[in-house]
Amino acid sequence: METLKEEEQFRNFDTPLLNTPHHLKEETQIQQKEREQQQQQQQQLQQQLQLQNERENRNHNITEELNKIPSSNNSSNSSSPNPLSISVSSSLGSASSIHLTPQGTIGNYLVIKTIGRGQFGKVKLGYHKKIPNEKVAIKIINKGKLDPETLKMVQREVRIMKLLHHPNIIRLYEVIETSRALYLIMEYAGEGEVMDFMIAHGVLTESQARTFFTQIVSAINYCHSKRAVHRDLKPENLLLDCNRQIKIIDFGLSNVFTPGSYLKTFCGSPTYASPELILRKEYNGPSVDVWSMGVVLFVLVTGYLPFDGDNYVELFQKILAGNYTIPSYLTHECKSLISRMLVVDPDKRATMEEIINHPWLSSTKQIILSTTMTDSLKNLNSCLEQQINVENLLNQSLNNSNNNNINNINNINNTMATMNNSNNNNNNNNNNNNNNNNNNNNNNNNNNNNNNNNNNNNNNNNNNTTTTTNATTTTPITSPIQNRNNEELDQEIIEELVGLGFEREELCNSIRQNKYNDAASTYFLLQGKKLRESQQNQTDNAKKLEKFYSEPLTIPAHVGENSPLIKYKRHHKRSNTVDSPKSTNTPQYRSSNTQQNNHHHQQQQQQQQQQQQQHHHHTQQQNQQQSQQQYNNNNHNKPPTPTIVTTQASTTVNNHISINNNNNNNNNNNNNNNSSTPGSNTVSSTQSSSINSSVNPSPLCLSNAVPVSLREKLREKEATTTNTTTTTTTTTTTTTNTSSNNSSNQSISSISPPTSTSPNLQPFSLASTANNNNNNNNSNNNSNNNNNNNNNNNNSLNSHIQRRATASSLQQQQQMQQASNTRRLRSNSSSVADQSQRQESRKLEDDWVIFEDYSNDGHRDGQPKNYHLQPSSLSSHKKQKSPVHSFLSSFKNILKRSDDKSFNSSSSNNNTNNNNTTTSVSTNNTPRTLEVDHQNSNNNNQQATSSSPNVTSPSSPSQQQQQEPRIVRFVFGVNTTTMKDAPELMQQVLKVVDTFCIPHTKKAPFLIECETEGVRFSIEICRLPRLSVNGLKFKRIGGSSWRYKSICKDLLSQMKLNSH
């Protein structure tokens, strides 16, 4: 009973609480919230105390460990042998002790490892000694390797980075300069490039792309407001920090512009370059960045580039024509924004104001405008307000109110003019006029008032002169000194820095005067760290990050190795392409996707086919031998009939076959032994297989480029075409060999189509004696054509050619041994004009490419830059065109060229084996059709020569390596280009080197090493297959860079690189 009563009392006690008025319930809820807030505050205070204690303990431990390390700025001498224990916080927030071995110390920073390589130096990861877990990026630039022009570019980059303070631009903290190097301490963005992010996640949605693009627009708009232009915007130069914030890097190509003027420096990456850069027109800075932003936005929303091509000619043509397609799945607003930015005419292209006000960015317009006004500008406004208030107080104490108002107006106009970045000269003129008016007005006043007004005017003039001096030296317009009070600075950070050993007054002065020293950099590092921690603790930001990364894609996208952007990644390992080295010991006629497991099985099958072909050749050639001899006896004065070998490959075959008989005395012996061994009138199985591999285009050249369907078709057609091609080639060789009994050294050539434009290369082993051999061969050819019935002359001629061939073969063997260990074999790529080959070849890889700076006349330092292809008809007295103009015009001339240009090449005889004639077949991997010469030998008294070098064994890599220069993929890998043949160009180089009396040694037929004036350098002739030209490459091995450049300029000035 008692328990029941207690329960009733408890219920009665609860009932009034349940029936309490509404306002009483609200009071109780408010009290509960206040209690919860107090508890949270207490927890936060406890956490802050714990963090402070942890920091003090870490600083104490680090200082003890750093005292053991010898303090030195030299990174080589300052590295400690024992590893340094540094507490590094992981991405999950848990602190873990990791043993890091610093490579050295630079100021207050420990250098850990190399994280990248820039245009002018390396970028290393560093840790601050006094701030735990604070990472920085240290860009190290070796001043000894910089010429005056690049040194100016580095200094300009530093000045522009000092000017820019934006949350989406990488920040410069400190500059340390020594006699040897320049150290730039910059902000570290640890999430990597946007390109890596897209390769890992695929195509971005429009909302994700909008967040990235909003930050890019905000940063670029801020740069343009500071009169700075980036000129190298691309996803590789966009980094991400831990809070998914864009950080723009690499201001090495940036410059300052003035409104209404034009820039003349042509730089950037080809796939992101605007049409005015390609056409070498003068341009205004913002339009170039707008075009690059359009390409970046296209890449963000589609996952591939809008302009792409197999080579630079096709790429530039698409850019100049504005030929691109926008996917249909994009919204109308996104399509319109991309189309407005990718306008070929820079005058009609969208401006930054139009981009900010575009409907696609309407939701983020306020973010762009708010982030454009950075802390520096806000502080500048506060400084102006303080100055105006002080001046008003001074003016109130004066008697003459009219003059005071004029001074206030002048001061306001002067300061607002610096904020709006107007012309400095106009501002100075206005200030001088205003000051003169003030002086005239002050003449009517008292002497005291005149003195005060003149002092104010002098102060204004001093402020204006500081800005004009910067403008005259083409430096960015720097903001005035930020007169920050101690109240504006973060007192917690200052107290922490004072505890670390910094003096309060020096610290405040360095921050106020915007100095880039140790004190200011440490302050800004702690400020940035505090801002990042506050952003990470915000729940809204964490939710946004989760939503950003978890947002589903509207279209399927390839990621990882299957991403279409993987080939544009600068550090990605390149796959085997047409220009990559390949071994030619194995038979070249195989499919492009053959695996290594089936390699030996294919070799066995080919050997069986070759053995079957040998028996077929013997029986067929014995039947044809008598008929061919009768035909040649009756028609020995007529030129050989043209034979055209066609195959069913996917590309057109343009190989040239030249057949030389060295011994006519051995014909009888060889004819008697036809039943047992193949003689001069037959071709061995190895030779027929080599002809087959040379006539058909090597599918190895199309590796990783031919689609799967084309590869399957090629594999199916290989089995059907092997037998037909070998029989046709053997019949052609027998006809020519039998006809050459009376006239040796006859060649079969055909009319080359206008698509075959690669210049002819002479045999590599006879480069030193090319002139003598050419003259002797031409005279021998003329004498043989005029005296076909004279056997004595033929015997003497053949013996002379045989002796020369054996001598050249000995020279080739010696050079093979020297060059086989140091040089690599590279196969030729297809011609620029071959349409079918271009469709099957691999797409152009966009490495970071920097064009050269040109003046109005296309020269730099008085030296012409022939980086691109120039037309052969260009004469010396004509005005020199720009490299890109000549590059495009020469491509048009190549397509229209027919038989105007004579292809001269020297046919050299090779060594003989067992007194048998050898068949020399051109083995250029570039496919060609057989040239047929219909000219009559009686009228012209001259035989047409083949336009490709003669190679004894096409399957041997060492000999093919010797007879062709090294392949260079891109134009910027050489110093200059020319249409001359490689042997002729080598003779020109040797002639110029001899005129300057420079001692040199010939390391290879197309490579020499020179040493003079304490400078050692090499000169190499390279091959540019994409442009069908030869390049000249200079490389400094040792010595002073100044003397090396002067020597190279002298040598290039004396070389005649234009083809005649």
Curated annotation (Swiss-Prot):
It comes from the Eukaryota. SMART domains: S_TKc, UBA. InterPro entries: KA1/Ssp2_C, KA1_dom, Kinase-like_dom_sf, Prot_kinase_dom, Protein_kinase_ATP_BS, UBA. The keyword Transferase applies. Residues 38-52, 68-88, 409-475, 603-613, 620-637, 650-699, 720-760, 771-799, 811-831, 904-926, 935-965 have a biased composition (Low complexity). GO terms for biological process: intracellular signal transduction. It catalyses: L-seryl-[protein] + ATP = O-phospho-L-seryl-[protein] + ADP + H(+); L-threonyl-[protein] + ATP = O-phospho-L-threonyl-[protein] + ADP + H(+). The active site is at D232. It is an enzyme of class 2 (transferase). Residues 1008-1057 form the KA1 domain. Residues 1-11, 23-37, 837-846 have a biased composition (Basic and acidic residues). The keyword Heme does not apply. Pfam families: KA1 (PF02149), Pkinase (PF00069). Keywords: ATP-binding, Kinase, Nucleotide-binding, Serine/threonine-protein kinase, Transferase. One of its GO terms (cellular component) is cytoplasm. One of its GO terms (molecular function) is protein serine kinase activity. Residues 1-52, 67-88, 409-488, 560-701, 714-886, 899-966 are annotated as: Disordered. Residues 577-594, 761-770 have a biased composition (Polar residues). Its EC number is 2.7.11.1. Residues 488-528 form the UBA domain. ATP binds at I115, G116, R117, G118, Q119, F120, G121, K122, V123, K139. Residues 109-361 form the Protein kinase domain. Belongs to the protein kinase superfamily. CAMK Ser/Thr protein kinase family. SNF1 subfamily. PANTHER family: KP78A-RELATED, MAP/MICROTUBULE AFFINITY-REGULATING KINASE. This is Probable serine/threonine-protein kinase MARK-A. It comes from Dictyostelium discoideum (Social amoeba).
